[in-house]
Amino acid sequence: MNAPRPHDLLWGMPVSALPADAPQWALDVLAGAQPVVVRRAICDHGWVAVGLRGQGRTQRFAALMRLVDIQRQQGPEALRGPGQSPWPALQALASVAPVLNASGLAWGPTGGAGYQIATGIEVLHTGSDLDLLLHTPQPLARAQARELLDILDCAPCRIDVQLETPAGAVALREWAGFARRVLLKSDHGPRLVGDPWAAQERAA
């Protein structure tokens, strides 16, 4: 099993692993054998930072999971939506898949769309955005980012893409803009950087 990465879905976290102040809905999530989502944070050896999601944006809970409890692991790259769907987010996923496949880069849905595809639990609604993760181990020119964003903005719903770099993640929409520095999300927290791929930024 590969080391868990941000946005991976993990199954196997026991209810007993939750702290005493965990809300009842979080206990219900684990009791129902639903997965947790890997989040960015520094953890002690043998642990991974995860998040639990319930119904709606207000039901989110941060926790820690032991690596030995992982029974199954699924990354966004393994998820693909159904060919037909009434949900705009999944319609958008189907419409942009050929473009992203042609890029040659690993990618996949995260957020509500990824969770629904992986679990079969309907968490999307007609106003849901589509969240995507695009692995960019090599720098993506800002002009290329703007071209890709122009294509994605023609989809049936808003699409938010996180570019996963060796240093962390940056929003495609922000990288396609003209600001000199952009917000990089890393295990050490968010910070503004000029180049999300630069080794010196990772060491900062």
UniProtKB/Swiss-Prot annotation:
Enzyme Commission identifier(s): 2.7.7.66
**Record's InterPro entries?**
Holo-ACP_synthase, MdcG_C, MdcG_N
Where along the chain is the active site annotated? Answer: 129, 131
Q: What HAMAP family has UniProt attached to this entry?
A: Malonate_MdcG
The job of this chain, per UniProt, is described as:
Transfers 2'-(5-triphosphoribosyl)-3'-dephosphocoenzyme-A to the apo-[acyl-carrier-protein] of the malonate decarboxylase to yield holo-[acyl-carrier-protein].
Q: Which domain of life is it from?
A: Bacteria
- Family, as annotated: Belongs to the MdcG family.
Give the main EC class: transferase
Q: Which reaction does it catalyse?
A: apo-[malonate decarboxylase ACP] + 2'-(5''-triphospho-alpha-D-ribosyl)-3'-dephospho-CoA = holo-[malonate decarboxylase ACP] + diphosphate
Keyword Isomerase found: no
Molecular function (Gene Ontology), one example: nucleotidyltransferase activity
The entry's protein name is Phosphoribosyl-dephospho-CoA transferase
The keyword Membrane is annotated on this UniProt entry = no
Could you tell me the keywords of this UniProt record? Nucleotidyltransferase, Transferase
